[in-house]
Structure formats: C-alpha cells, structure tokens
Amino acid sequence: MMTLTNAQIGQLAAQFFFAGAGTLSFAILFACPRRALPCCALVGAVGWFIYELAILYGADAAAAALIAVIPLSLAARICAVLLKTPVTVFLLTGIFPLVPGAGIYYTAYYFIQGNNSLALANGISTFKVAVALAVGIALVLGLPLPQAPFWKRK
C-alpha cells in the first residue's frame, strides 16, 4: 500500500478547496437555490478529491471517474433528500469537475490539425470517462430510496 507524502496531502487539500470553489461558481451560474450552494460545492469537492486519490493510487482516468462518481452520486442523493431539492441540482453541478472537457477539446483540436491517431486516442479515452460517469450515476440512482415502515407512513 502506498503512503501519501506531506506534499501530496497538501496538494489534495488544495485541489479539494479549488474543486469546491469551481463547483460553487458553476452552481451560482446554473442558478441553483442559495440554500443548496454549500452542498453543491461539497459534492463537487468530494468527487474531485476521490478522483485525484484514485489517480494517485494508480487508476486510469476512466476507472478513477467511476470510483469517484459513485460516492458523488450518493452524496448528491443524500443532499437532495435532506434539502428536499431535486437530485439533478447536486448531480449536474457535482460532476462538473469530472466531465472530460479538455479531452473533448483536444480530440477536436487534433482532428482539425490532421493528427488522426492522437484524435482517435483522445476520443476513445474521453468516451471511456463519459461512459464511466454515466454508468456510475445509473448504478446509484437505480437504487431505491429507503422507505418508512408502512405503519409510519401518512
């Protein structure tokens, strides 16, 4: 098992903070309710933290995205229940740091430059990450919410 150095821990803490700030900014731009903004930032920061941790432990980008999006989706679902807000508010803003925007950009860039082999490699990698995100979200959102016992239901 690999141990993290102090520098890596500091870098992870900084990335956690900046991922939360970026997610918060996107949530404000997305016009999320004010009371949901802290949870939006926390969901995005947690997802990015787990992604970076998985990368540090040797996972590739697609596996790290899958590992990160499962707890991210769980956190989004918990926040949605606690704040009585649609889960999409937390999910859309929370996956913002994980979406492979740079991969899409470089795929198009290499394609325009005529470097088809790099475009294909980037496109496949980007597609894997996107599929991993979709599968992870579907796995978590496919789970039923816990129900109150029938004698406590109104």
Model-derived regions: residue spans:
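Hydrophobic alpha-helical membrane segments
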Residues: 94-106
